[in-house]
């Protein structure tokens, strides 16, 4: 490969790929292009920065220069890719262009901001760069509104509450974590958040935001309103697929790839939050790690299909942490819930009494690996 491999992106997926490639080939040219600084940080830490009193710069684990030196890379930070010419195998920015033999798209996904009037007043915490832009406002805020009661929204609500802030969480679902599990399973965490002082506005809709002299006025449905100092959007992630579209790639919820992480173009691959693998979007660390291992082999000519095991998802709410696995969102499961003071085990079984999913909490999380072995592959 005279031109080598070009990777667009510098987050967890891109770095895992680089490490796996370099384990197998120390000399193949590797070029990384990204719109950010390319410094390494641990993205899950963003759910805990406020209670930990951390600044954005505290999150940096390795600078871009150190990364480039360690793994023999050509890095182009603070660089926006404007176009991909798939036929000529060229990546273009405003001032530069790079020829590639193989191209990997690993640009992640952006936080979705609900399209309501005043949406520009909403903050997002999807990157170190985004946190750096709003850390002073968040640190000084006494009243915080979190829009979205999913995994990230629940983690942030607990973190801001632990930091002594008045937290309101709004979601149009009837319970928190509604896309992950039924209300009878999430109720333990929901109750804990309420006990801590989080004000839950469920089955509620944010209609607009307006700056006032004393903060931000959030208008809700049913003629309600609340004044806060900061509003955070935690309503999910959306891959930015415009670049892939211009390259003529097949797009659905992400860039569509097969078991080899290959897109509809033989020389272009996708990884991480950006990729939709055989119809699945898996924005969690373990599938990204496994995908990076397989993709490194494929890029170097050792074609290997990705085979994902059943994996744990961890909800990092320190006062009441949860692990879950399997088809927890299935509507037809019967849930057998065993609750004790030290934790909960919830088993989701089908009509044949076959375990299909489980959720465990607190001290009973140690039972997760035993349950994981009994789930069908």
Swiss-Prot record:
The enzyme's E.C. designation: 1.18.1.-
Catalytic activity: 2 reduced [nitric oxide reductase rubredoxin domain] + NAD(+) + H(+) = 2 oxidized [nitric oxide reductase rubredoxin domain] + NADH
Gene3D superfamilies from the UniProt entry: 3.30.390.120, FAD/NAD(P)-binding domain
Pfam families: Pyr_redox_2, Rbx_binding
Biological pathway: Nitrogen metabolism; nitric oxide reduction
GO cellular component: cytoplasm
Localization, UniProt: Cytoplasm
Keywords: Cytoplasm, FAD, Flavoprotein, NAD, Oxidoreductase
Top-level class of the enzyme under EC nomenclature: oxidoreductase
Protein name: Nitric oxide reductase FlRd-NAD(+) reductase
Organism: Shigella boydii serotype 4 (strain Sb227)
Source lineage: Bacteria, Pseudomonadati, Pseudomonadota, Gammaproteobacteria, Enterobacterales
């Amino acid at each position: 490969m005279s031109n080598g491999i070009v990777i667009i992106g510098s987050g967890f997926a891109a770095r895992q790929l680089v490490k796996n490639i370099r384990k197998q080939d120390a000399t193949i040219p590797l070029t990384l292009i990204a719109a950010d600084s390319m410094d390494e940080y641990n993205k899950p830490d963003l759910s805990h920065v406020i209670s930990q009193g951390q600044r954005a710069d505290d999150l940096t684990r390795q600078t871009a220069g150190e990364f480039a030196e360690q793994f023999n890379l050509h890095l182009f930070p603070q660089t926006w890719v404007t176009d991909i010419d798939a036929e000529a195998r060229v990546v273009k920015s405003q001032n530069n262009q790079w020829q590639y033999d193989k191209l990997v798209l690993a640009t992640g996904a952006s936080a979705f901001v609900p399209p309501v009037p005043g949406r520009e007043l909403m903050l997002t915490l999807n990157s170190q760069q985004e946190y750096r832009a709003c850390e002073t406002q968040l640190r000084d805020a006494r009243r915080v509104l979190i829009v979205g009661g999913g995994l990230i929204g629940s983690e942030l609500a607990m973190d801001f509450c632990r930091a002594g802030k008045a937290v309101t969480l709004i979601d149009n679902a009837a319970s928190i974590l509604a896309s992950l599990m039924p209300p009878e399973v999430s109720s333990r965490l929901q109750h804990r958040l309420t006990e801590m002082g989080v004000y839950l506005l469920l089955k509620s809709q944010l209609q607009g935001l307006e700056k006032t002299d004393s903060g931000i006025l959030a208008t809700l449905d049913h003629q309600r309103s609340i004044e806060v100092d900061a509003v955070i959007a935690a309503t999910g992630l959306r891959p930015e697929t415009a670049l892939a579209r211009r390259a003529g790639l097949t797009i659905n919820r992400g860039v569509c790839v097969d078991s080899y992480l290959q897109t509809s173009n033989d020389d272009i691959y996708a990884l991480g939050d950006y990729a939709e693998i055989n119809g699945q979007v898996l924005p969690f660390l373990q599938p990204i790690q496994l995908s990076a291992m397989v993709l490194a082999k494929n890029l170097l000519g050792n074609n290997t299909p990705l085979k994902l095991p059943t994996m744990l998802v961890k909800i990092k709410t320190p006062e009441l942490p949860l692990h879950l696995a399997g088809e927890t969102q299935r509507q037809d499961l019967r849930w057998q819930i065993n609750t004790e003071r030290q934790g909960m085990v919830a088993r989701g079984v089908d009509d044949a009494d076959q375990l299909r999913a489980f959720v465990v909490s607190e001290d009973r999380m140690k039972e997760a690996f035993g349950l994981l072995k009994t789930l069908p592959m």
